């Protein structure tokens, strides 16, 4: 049985917390203004109609309505189809 831990065993044993990224509201779901739609690193999804983009590239709803995913110019976009008031 070894009485020393070994060269690298004391330098291991670390892990970072998950960042909880991804789509939070899917196509067809109804949302209110300010709700987070997508958490992402970089612009995998781009903001479309009634959607804003935060400093960390998070997409959020600017108006109440239903979520719609689509493409425009080869980019994936997220739109909010506003509810008729």
Curated annotation (Swiss-Prot):
Alphabetically sorted, this entry's keywords are: Ribonucleoprotein, Ribosomal protein
Provide ranges: composition bias, Polar residues: 7-19
Could you tell me the superkingdom of the organism this chain comes from?
Answer: Bacteria
Name the GO cellular-component terms: cytosolic large ribosomal subunit
GO terms (molecular function) for this protein are: structural constituent of ribosome
HAMAP family reported for this sequence: Ribosomal_bL27
Q: What is this protein called?
A: Large ribosomal subunit protein bL27
Q: Which organism is it from?
A: Leifsonia xyli subsp. xyli (strain CTCB07)
Q: Which gene encodes it?
A: rpmA
